[in-house]
Swiss-Prot record:
It comes from the Bacteria. Belongs to the pterin-4-alpha-carbinolamine dehydratase family. This is Putative pterin-4-alpha-carbinolamine dehydratase. The keyword Lyase applies. SUPFAM superfamilies: PCD-like. GO terms for molecular function: 4-alpha-hydroxytetrahydrobiopterin dehydratase activity. It comes from Rhodopseudomonas palustris (strain BisB18).
Amino acid sequence: MVKRLTDEDRHAALRELPGWSAAEGREAIARTFVFKDFNEAFGFMARVALIAEKHDHHPEWRNVYKTVEVVLTTHDAGGVTARDIDLARAMNAIAAQLSPR
């Protein structure tokens, strides 16, 4: 099982993840991505889904038109792990390629 990050490690990781913050009221990190339109938002989700499936680590997310709200946590560990940080980095890289606002 993957080990949950300490508070200090989680805060340090968040400093290196633009747009991400601690999720309110739970042991998780969150970010809202805003894209040009629905097609771009859905394209982002499709690309992330491929990575998530490959690593067997799936986000909690919600899509409304051009907005994708994401929450990452590792349920088995009861909080944020390196797997969440890695997926957040991948999401930021994909979003940067698609030029979100």
